[in-house]
Amino acid sequence: TANIARLLAKQGNKVFIIDADINTPSMNTEFEGDHPHEMIWVHSSGNMFSKFIYLEKSMVRQYLELAKKKIHSINPDYVLIDTPPSVTNVHIELLSRVKVSYVLFVTQPTKLSNQDVLRTMDFFHERCGKVNCGIVENMCYGTEHNEYPIRLVAQIPMQDNMNTENLLTNAYNEFQKIVDEIVQSDIVVLEEYSTENGYDENFDVTDIHITGSRKHYFTHELKY
């Protein structure tokens, strides 16, 4: 996520990063402060709750709501959401507030990692519908060939001694493939559902059945 943001910023785009790995944030170590670069803004729990080792649900909601306010204020060209490897309640909270236009699944070319990605894919398809998505293989040796149900966008090579300091330079072409994919997918990477400009009927219960003197509410579908 950090290197994609750096490359987008280098090409003149305003980038806002939401660190959705609440318990073990990393964007606060990748970047210094909330506005580390002229074109990059970082929203990380590592900056906001640096003295906490556990965040209550209300704090997570506060964190996500503040992210939405920052989007209004910054008006970025791209919003990148860095998520933990496994699905958490934060994913569910986040997807109840936002609509994503592209999901990038990062995996390693191993059987176990591939299985995890396939399970995560099912979750996002259920929550996001038919959204554009792709796979990035990380820590590759260039000899493996894996089949995926969606497009393989890029393969990031294994670095000597696991040193990722110059990763963007060493794998520039692969990161450019990712950026090209994101740029072509949609003009807006993330948009929020809002009632700010009036009542939003997307949140309506689509069917209510009333029987006799008692009211029974059957929710057939909730549009998020």
Predicted regions and their residues:
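Walker A/P-loop NTP-binding active-site region of P-loop NTPases
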Residues: 1-38, 78
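Glycine-rich, phosphate-binding/catalytic loops in enzymes
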Residues: 33, 59-61, 96-99
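A short helix-to-beta-strand connector/capping loop
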Residues: 35-44, 131, 151
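Cytosolic-facing regulatory segments adjacent to core modules
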Residues: 44, 48-88
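Amphipathic alpha-helical transducer elements in NTP-driven molecular machines
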Residues: 57, 61-65, 111-118, 168, ...
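Conserved catalytic-core segment of NTP-binding enzymes
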Residues: 70-74, 78, 84-161
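C-terminal lobe/tail of nucleotide-utilizing enzymes
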Residues: 125-224
